[in-house]
């Protein structure tokens, strides 16, 4: 930990610097690979919607010693068409999910389960969701997502600047797209718990991005007036100054989510925990990546296209004080912008005592 603390101090002071902004094409290429894989997964496999969204019937039997194969065989004997999903929940529960059934078919499934497992029909937890209700839930979930993005974009545009809002939304869409693609790849059901997980990672990704952008705004406030360094150089220092904090926060967030995913869902077989924890785990990891490697470089790309910033980059290059970030791939060069020194409460003038 002392080594990590020392690295954080060197990154903050500028003694050590990683060229996050200058290597933007490398980060974009990595994201492009994951996005293409997500597109392929969505096109080939698609999302496996739960019965809450597409409609269907769910039957949960609570009895120790029952197996998935036995439950699947008992329902297959009824002659149900379509996909039948059987999940083991813990040691004593089995959940059977089917498509939309008529009342006669539903009663036949319940009767088959009572005969196969020797239980009372009242002990079977039956849930039937109509297709129209599932479509309504899907529509409301999409409306909520779009409303969230619009409100966040307006807030960031007013609190920071419009281009920061654009970069933050690009990072959020990047996170959601990759998370949804991995979800389609592993084949987990998309349930209301999954939607909650998606909305949660949107909030976390924006939170981490806003912290980085706040430091970027501080470092670039008077970058054109000073004229000693480019916008990308100032933004790169801001990323270096916040990366250790982002890594620590993300690690602390991932540890409990990982324990829920691998222990709670993997060993105990809790379906709801699995749906929620997988979305959170992937989203937190991807959100941390985008807040460092996607949002700041994309913001720098937008700002460096401005005529004022292009003129600033030419002035800096002509002086020969330090080359613009785009022209160098060094990861250990000391940046020309330095954080404020001799500031803070310890360095303030002391008040004289009253006589």
Segments from the language model and where they lie:
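A structural signal for conserved, well-ordered secondary-structure elements
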Residues: 1-355
């Amino acid at each position: 930990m002392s080594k990590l603390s020392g690295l954080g101090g060197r990154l903050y002071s500028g003694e050590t610097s990683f060229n996050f902004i200058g290597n933007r094409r490398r980060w974009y290429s990595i994201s492009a690979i994951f996005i293409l894989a997500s597109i392929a997964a969505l096109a080939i496999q698609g999302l496996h919607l739960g019965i809450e969204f597409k409609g269907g019937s769910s039957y949960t039997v609570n009895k120790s010693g029952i197996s998935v194969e036995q439950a699947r065989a008992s329902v297959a004997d009824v002659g149900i068409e379509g996909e039948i999903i059987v999940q083991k929940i813990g040691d004593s529960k089995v959940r059977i999910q089917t498509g939309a059934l008529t009342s006669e078919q539903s009663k036949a499934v319940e009767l088959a389960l009572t005969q196969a497992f020797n239980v009372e029909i009242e002990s079977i937890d039956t849930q039937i969701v109509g297709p129209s209700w599932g479509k309504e839930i899907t529509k409301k979930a999409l409306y909520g997502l779009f409303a969230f993005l619009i409100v966040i974009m307006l807030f960031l545009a007013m609190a920071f600047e419009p281009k920061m809002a654009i970069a933050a939304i690009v990072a959020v869409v990047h996170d959601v797209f990759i998370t949804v693609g991995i979800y389609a790849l592993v084949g987990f059901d998309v349930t209301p718990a999954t939607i909650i997980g998606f909305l949660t990672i949107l909030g976390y990704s924006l939170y981490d991005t806003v912290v980085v952008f706040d430091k970027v705004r501080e470092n670039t406030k008077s970058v054109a007036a000073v004229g000693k360094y480019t916008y990308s150089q100032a933004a790169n220092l801001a990323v270096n100054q916040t990366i250790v904090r982002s890594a620590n926060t993300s690690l602390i967030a991932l540890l409990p989510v990982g324990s829920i995913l691998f222990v709670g869902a993997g060993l105990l077989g809790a379906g709801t925990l699995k749906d929620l924890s997988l979305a959170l785990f992937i989203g937190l990891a991807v959100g941390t990546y985008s807040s460092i490697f996607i949002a700041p470089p994309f913001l720098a790309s937008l700002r460096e296209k401005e005529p004022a910033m292009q003129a600033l980059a030419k002035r800096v290059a002509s002086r020969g004080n330090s080359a613009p970030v785009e022209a160098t791939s060094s990861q250990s060069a000391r940046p020309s912008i330095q954080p404020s020194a001799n500031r803070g409460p310890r360095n303030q003038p002391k008040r004289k005592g009253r006589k």
